[in-house]
């Protein structure tokens, strides 16, 4: 599409983790046709990762570098790649030079202050993976899993002064089947959000500009996800622990301890059968039988059976810390004393 440069929608994209990539890709795809101008991509700064401590960009930072090469190869001006610890004077000056019309953000991880937002004549919009005002905050995907919701969704909101309180431009529902992990649901929300975003951005190409509607209903906020959020309390019910395992995959991973060694649990399910007849009764330090966290035995279809404070959980994929992730059968080959022991 041939347009005068001054009439094209000029976008600055802000995002960092993998969930932002489909939205970035969709915007870049359209910008390559000349319909929009992707002025820049702002991401979190590079960080040291892994045991070697090598400095690496975030997922959006890696893709931004490749996109810049692709734009150049097409004879187009490459989007500027911006990485700042804060959005203060230096960042504002860099963005101001790009003269963007609209800020588009998805999981950037920082608050946009009024001085920063004043750089965008059309303001800003944000992709948020929940049905706002439900689950405002940084971990709405994990929250929906932890709460065992039957539906969640994606919202496109105006960026407002207070976090996740902006007027709603569009929403889409995502049905849940109760087996999603944070990883799998992030993938679904990423695709759904990108599709929704492009439809909303098209509305900014014409007058009147979309205004959105105020958020309706009671607001709720996400639990702050921390490393310790993965620690399993076997006194809780099997459905609660199952949801915790799924919500903590891929981070921080659900964890328990066996004979002083940390175990990461990747997959589990609710067990509706009877306790195994060939299992060994687990004992705690006081000698009482079958405590919570007791490893009761196995079910050939479901995995390793563990007693919880409400029901039995079947573990199917797990690992000792820093060792190979294994299906339950292979795991037990290297843990002969596991059945009849207790997880804490």
Locations of the language-model features?
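One-carbon transfer enzymes
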Residues: 1-252, 320-322, 327, 332, ...
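An anion-binding loop in the catalytic cleft
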Residues: 2-4, 235-344
């Amino acid at each position: 599409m041939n347009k005068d440069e001054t009439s094209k929608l000029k976008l600055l994209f802000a995002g960092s983790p993998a969930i932002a990539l489909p939205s970035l890709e969709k915007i870049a795809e359209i910008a390559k046709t000349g319909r929009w101008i992707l002025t820049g991509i702002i991401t979190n700064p590079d960080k040291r990762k892994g045991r070697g401590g090598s400095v690496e960009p975030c997922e959006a930072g890696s893709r931004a570098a490749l996109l810049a090469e692709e734009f150049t190869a097409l004879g187009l001006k490459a989007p500027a790649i911006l990485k700042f610890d804060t959005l203060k004077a230096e960042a504002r000056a860099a963005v101001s030079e790009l003269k963007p019309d609209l800020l588009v953000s998805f999981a950037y991880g920082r608050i946009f202050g009024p001085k920063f937002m004043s750089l965008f004549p059309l303001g800003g919009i944000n992709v948020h993976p929940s049905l706002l005002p439900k689950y405002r905050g940084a971990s709405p995907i994990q929250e929906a899993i932890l709460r065992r919701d039957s539906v969640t969704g994606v919202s496109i909101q105006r960026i407002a002064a207070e976090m996740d309180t902006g007027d709603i431009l569009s929403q889409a529902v995502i049905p849940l089947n109760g087996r999603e992990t944070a990883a799998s649901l992030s993938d679904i929300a990423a695709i759904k959000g990108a599709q929704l975003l492009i439809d909303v951005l098209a509305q900014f190409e014409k007058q009147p500009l979309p205004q959105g509607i105020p958020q309706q209903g009671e607001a709720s906020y996400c639990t702050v996800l921390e490393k310790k959020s993965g620690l399993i309390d076997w006194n809780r019910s099997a459905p609660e622990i199952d949801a915790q395992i799924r919500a903590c995959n891929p981070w921080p991973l659900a964890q328990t301890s066996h004979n002083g060694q940390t175990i990461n649990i990747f997959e589990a399910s609710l067990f509706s059968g009877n306790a195994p007849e060939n299992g060994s009764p687990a004992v705690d330090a006081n000698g009482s039988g079958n405590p919570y966290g007791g490893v009761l035995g196995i079910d050939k279809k479901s995995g390793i059976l563990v007693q919880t404070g409400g029901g039995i959980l079947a573990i199917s994929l797990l690992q000792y810390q820093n060792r190979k992730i294994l299906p339950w059968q292979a795991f037990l080959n290297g843990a002969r004393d596991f059945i009849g022991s207790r997880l804490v």
